[in-house]
Amino acid sequence: MNKEQLEKMKNGKGFIAALDQSGGSTPKALKEYGVNEDQYSNEDEMFQLVHDMRTRVVTSPSFSPDKILGAILFEQTMDREVEGKYTADYLADKGVVPFLKVDKGLAEEQNGVQLMKPIDNLDSLLDRANERHIFGTKMRSNILELNEQGIKDVVEQQFEVAKQIIAKGLVPIIEPEVNINAKDKAEIEKVLKAELKKGLDSLNADQLVMLKLTIPTEPNLYKELAEHPNVVRVVVLSGGYSREKANELLKDNDELIASFSRALASDLRADQSKEEFDKALGDAVESIYDASVNKN
């Protein structure tokens, strides 16, 4: 593990850029960027277009390591190059810590939750991540209803996989998303917090994780988790809120920082000039940084 990157993730001021839309969500991400499905004819062309978009983001002067601590990549992005270097090396050289999304998507809903599908190639994927100088990983589950068994299952699965990731020398981001429209969102979050605390308490002193959570209904609910000795950082997802709304809610939560995807890229368009693109990205970065660093 890179100690300098660990220090940056633990104590740095800023947020994490989530650039990890994968196969299923790519057409939607491209469409929002202004690239329609008639502009590519197969998956390779689609992934090249999305890589072009991500290259434009990470090479922009607005994508500054003074504001952006880390970036989460999709497997395809890890294997591609930016300006002649593998993406993770390009980011690390720029001062941004690289993470890799490792999950294979969500299983069918059961007990009010969606567990992760089995990650059959996890071992070889983590070996490749190490070769590519990736610092950590990210994997997402989804909680839709107040169901204690379901929430317990989500957290147990996350920690089980997290321990395999830690054994390979990487720092896992555990992401049990709570749907922002869930009827009993505040109650779900209390149960989730208790289960996460149990999981964290089961780790050895040298087993470090990060958490990526939905912004809680009750401000500072997760402060205790952020202060847990095994937690490097707690980051939050935008989860369907607009950037303005997500930033506003984030400001009420001390010690939590953003890890936004859609809320970061929502004003970026393929046909913008370099100046327009850099300004739109810069405005987004500035506001998300502010919500991550300057609290109410």
UniProtKB/Swiss-Prot annotation:
Its EC number is 4.1.2.13. GO terms for biological process: glycolytic process. Keywords: Glycolysis, Lyase, Schiff base. Pathway: Carbohydrate degradation; glycolysis; D-glyceraldehyde 3-phosphate and glycerone phosphate from D-glucose: step 4/4. GO terms for molecular function: fructose-bisphosphate aldolase activity. It catalyses: beta-D-fructose 1,6-bisphosphate = D-glyceraldehyde 3-phosphate + dihydroxyacetone phosphate. It holds the Pfam family Glycolytic. The active site is at 175 (proton acceptor), 212 (schiff-base intermediate with dihydroxyacetone-p). It is an enzyme of class 4 (lyase). SUPFAM superfamilies: Aldolase. PANTHER family: FRUCTOSE-BISPHOSPHATE ALDOLASE. Belongs to the class I fructose-bisphosphate aldolase family. This is Fructose-bisphosphate aldolase class 1. The gene is fda.
